[in-house]
């Protein structure tokens, strides 16, 4: 299948340099960009579909790096249907699960948390709501998960893990488990700030994050309760290369502060943007 988009207006290549595309036309073949150039170089008979952008702006699809999938385009937490399809209207074409923690009666035993992650990964591998790519199946870290469990999960296609909702006595108890998950090749996101749902840690602060060294400090501007200004400074200055995930469901003042810190310390490449929706707190 060949689709040509012509007469593109302003464009953005998705980098911090904000460079425009090298042309006003794009050709996609079998779902991937195959060519970028001038509209004048295209012939109508060479492509099955030609879309005239009529000067519209073209940017890469946006990625929501923190949402909570269950199964299907539905969450029982707010009894909401079709939210992923709705997000597509805002330009989001890819979503990354921050665990299936909102599944009613979710298991917390070793076998159950692995099964839940694998089931979610498999379901969304075969299901794209309105074409949105969903990376689901984020294993919720529990104290009894071992290095062998993480290796098994990775072989089974699970590559995401979430710290913050397991039955750990203190945030520091996560440290060896997070490190074992990362050693197996999983990308670990850690809940940051105050607790959001019953049964989770009351707070995961800078000390614990720096000790854990997750790949991503999830909703680092609060989910919904933010860290202190001093902790923000520590995460930015001492926490390299931990990604700093800012969410719309968090604290706006803290998000601005973190952006200012990242800019001042040359850490803008660590900033991620996400929604953290559907939220645990409504």
Q: Which stretches of residues belong to each language-model region?
A:
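N-terminal metal-binding scaffold of metallo-dependent hydrolase/deaminase domains
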Residues: 1-45
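Residue-level marker for buried hydrophobic side chains located in beta-strands
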Residues: 4, 61-63, 188-189, 273
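Divalent metal-coordination and catalytic microenvironments
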Residues: 8, 26, 31, 55, ...
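Metal-associated gating/positioning segment near the N- to mid-region
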Residues: 48, 52-116
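Active-site mouth loops of central-metabolism enzymes
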Residues: 65-78, 133-146, 193
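Short, acidic/polar
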Residues: 76-84, 142-153, 199-208
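Divalent metal-dependent hydrolysis catalytic cores, especially in the metallo-beta-lactamase
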Residues: 83-112, 127-141, 155-168, 186-189, ...
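Active-site core of metal-dependent hydrolases
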Residues: 158-281
């Amino acid at each position: 299948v060949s689709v040509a988009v012509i007469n593109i207006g302003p464009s953005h290549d998705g980098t911090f340099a904000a460079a425009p595309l090298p042309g006003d036309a794009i050709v996609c073949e079998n779902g991937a960009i195959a060519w970028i150039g001038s509209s004048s170089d295209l012939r109508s008979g060479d492509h099955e579909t030609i879309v005239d952008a009529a000067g519209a702006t073209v940017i890469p699809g946006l990625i929501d790096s923190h949402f909570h999938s269950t199964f299907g385009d539905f969450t029982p937490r707010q009894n909401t249907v079709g939210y992923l399809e709705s997000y597509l209207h805002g330009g989001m074409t890819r979503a990354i699960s921050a665990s299936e923690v909102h599944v009613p009666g979710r298991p917390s035993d070793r076998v159950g948390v692995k099964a839940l992650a694998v089931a979610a990964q498999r379901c969304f591998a075969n299901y794209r709501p309105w074409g949105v790519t969903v990376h689901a199946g984020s294993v919720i870290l529990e104290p009894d998960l071992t290095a062998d469990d993480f290796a098994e999960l990775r072989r089974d296609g699970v590559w995401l893990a979430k710290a913050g909702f397991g039955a750990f006595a203190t945030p520091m108890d996560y440290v060896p488990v997070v490190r074992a998950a990362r050693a197996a090749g999983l990308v670990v996101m850690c809940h940051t700030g105050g607790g959001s749902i019953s049964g989770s840690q009351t707070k995961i602060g800078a000390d614990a994050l720096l000790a854990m060294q997750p790949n991503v400090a999830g909703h680092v501007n609060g989910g919904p309760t933010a860290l202190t200004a001093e902790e923000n400074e520590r995460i930015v200055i001492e926490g390299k290369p931990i990604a700093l995930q800012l969410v719309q469901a968090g604290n706006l003042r803290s998000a601005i502060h973190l952006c200012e810190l990242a800019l001042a310390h040359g850490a803008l490449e660590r900033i991620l943007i996400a929604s953290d929706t559907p939220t645990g707190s409504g």
